[in-house]
Design a protein with these regions (language model features):
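A short SAM/SAH-binding and catalytic strip from SAM-dependent methyltransferases
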Residues: 145-165
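Conserved SAM/SAH-binding beta-strand->alpha-helix loop
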Residues: 95-96
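A short acidic, Gly/Pro-enriched loop at the edge of an enzyme's catalytic core
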Residues: 121-125, 139-148
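A short glycine-rich, Lys/Arg-flanked "PGG" loop and its adjoining helix->strand segment in the class I
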Residues: 164-177
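SAM-dependent methyltransferase
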Residues: 177-236
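N-terminal auxiliary segments of SAM/dcSAM-dependent transferases
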Residues: 1-31
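Conserved alpha-helix/loop element of class I SAM-dependent methyltransferases that forms part
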Residues: 48-67
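Conserved SAM-binding strand-loop segment of SAM-dependent methyltransferases
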Residues: 106-119
Length: 262
């Protein structure tokens, strides 16, 4: 699992986001994969407003509560929507260019930091320290989150199915008591579906939701990276091995879904 920060010369999506933020337009953001034909991500889509978001994203925003952590925030579209509702949101991304764009857009708390960086912590303190704090300051320094958002295929950052438990345990450590994780993904089995409704999936091979991608923007070429799509039953099962519960909140039109983990 990637635990680093992107360098600017290896950050095509960040470059595209910052270009669009500064000029209102951007070039082609190319998406390559060994599994699919070359595709293109519309940069304007990364700046969508609430009413332009897919139903699953809108539902996730409706379910947020308390102090929120938006992971892989990109251009900050989800964070800004929540800020407008008066909610406290911390946006993080491993792209320094995306974080620069977020700040230009008005995101109040945007930090270029990796989710697994120990400096991003729940902020839990010893009982002795907590006793020295007023009730208001305890809340301020507690540092945990009531809602953690991972949208636009939030399971992707795990990269491989074997890394999903580590991701869930890290998120669990960042949650306040009673907190929740809102995460979306897709079941890629439709790629292997036959006309008769059966599926040609190699059960002895790698998990079928493991994909590799590479992005290119102008002369900025990113490194190839692993990206994970997970079917809900497996996501729920892995969450349970981590001492968490998984709940299917809503399903989209094409094997995509929103889950709540708590």
């Amino acid at each position: 699992m990637n635990t680093k920060i992107l360098s600017k010369d290896k950050d095509p999506m960040g470059a595209a986001i910052l270009d669009y933020q500064k000029s209102g337009r951007a070039g082609r953001l190319r998406v390559l994969s060994s599994m699919f034909e070359e595709d293109e991500m519309p940069v304007k889509h990364l700046f969508r407003k609430v009413e332009e978001m897919p139903m699953l994203e809108q539902k996730a925003l409706q379910l947020t509560k308390g102090r929120i952590l938006d992971i892989g925030a990109g251009s900050g579209c989800h964070t800004l929507a929540l800020q407008e509702k008066g909610l406290e949101v911390k946006a993080i991304d491993i792209s320094p260019l995306s974080c620069e764009a977020m700040k230009l857009r008005g995101v109040k708390d945007a930090e270029c930091i990796n989710l697994f960086d120990p400096h991003l912590s729940s902020g839990n303190h010893s009982e002795e320290h907590q006793k020295t704090l007023s009730e208001e300051n305890q809340k301020q320094f507690e540092g945990g989150f009531d809602t953690i958002l991972l949208l636009m295929n939030g399971t992707g950052i795990a990269g491989k199915i074997e890394n999903l438990p580590a991701l869930f345990l890290r998120l669990k450590a960042l949650l306040n008591p009673g907190g929740q994780i809102l995460i979306d993904s897709s079941d890629l089995k439709y790629i292997y579906e036959n006309e008769d409704g059966s599926f040609d999936i190699n059960l002895n091979g790698a998990y079928y939701g493991e994909v590799d991608y590479q992005m290119i923007y102008k002369d900025v070429k990113g490194d190839r990276f692993d990206w994970l799509y997970v079917d809900f039953p497996l996501l729920k099962s892995i969450a349970e091995t981590c001492g968490l519960h998984g709940e299917l909140v809503a399903e989209g039109e094409h094997y995509d879904y929103l889950a709540r983990i708590f």
